[in-house]
Design a protein with these regions (language model features):
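Intrinsically disordered, low-complexity terminal tails and inter-domain linkers enriched
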Residues: 2-22, 29, 108-120
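Intrinsic-disorder/low-complexity coil detector
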Residues: 12-14, 25-26, 129, 164
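Alpha-helical interaction segments
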Residues: 21, 45, 84-85, 131-132, ...
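Active-site-proximal alpha-helical scaffolds that flank and shape metal-associated catalytic sites
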Residues: 23, 27-31, 43, 47-51, ...
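Conserved, aromatic- and glycine-enriched, well-ordered alpha/beta core segments
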Residues: 26, 38-108
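A charged, amphipathic interaction segment
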Residues: 88-170
Length: 170
């Protein structure tokens, strides 16, 4: 991974000790892998699948790297679908940070669980944090007009109704 944790991930195969092999997985491929994993058990990519994909990214790469990985992945996906206007920078980052906050509080391991599948872990996580499955959750933190603004679509805008929980806890 790059020094800031946001570049391509380095993958060390199981035989790495013997061969010294290392592979670099570009962010686009990491996002595609996460998307394929989420969609393997889904008929459509709705809000729950967005949260699941985000949770996987946070769990495997940490919140800071997941902001970029998920943001760029969704932006590229919207562009490829001919709907670049569907990408929303503030909403994407806010959701990643909310999922990351709750994953950290839940004691979710960022390196994956050895005794349970990611799917089972996600279902348990979603059961513990049903508020994350509420598409209107961001309305607790942002005015509708703020989220509808061109500024919020194009880049990060801080909440204007209430601070995120991790800011309030400081």
């Amino acid at each position: 991974m790059s020094g800031d944790g946001r570049g391509a991930a380095e993958v060390v195969p199981q035989s790495a000790e013997q061969t010294g092999e290392r592979f670099v997985v570009p962010p686009a491929e990491r996002f595609a892998g996460l998307m394929a994993e989420v969609m393997a058990a889904a008929e459509r990519f709705g809000h729950r699948q967005h949260v699941h994909l985000t949770w996987l990214a946070v769990r495997r790469h940490g919140t800071a790297a997941a902001v970029d990985l998920v943001g760029e992945g969704i932006r590229r996906t919207a562009l490829a679908a001919g709907a670049p206007e569907k990408y929303h920078a503030t909403m994407t980052r806010a959701w990643v940070e909310l999922v990351g906050h709750h994953a950290g509080r839940a004691g979710t391991a960022l390196d994956g669980g050895a005794d349970r599948s990611d799917r089972a872990d996600f279902e348990a996580f979603a059961d513990r944090h049903p508020e994350l499955l509420d598409k209107a959750l961001l309305s607790r933190f942002y005015r509708t007009a703020t989220l509808a603004s061109a500024e919020a679509r194009a880049g990060w805008v801080e909440p204007d109704l209430r601070a995120f929980p991790w800011h309030a806890e400081r």
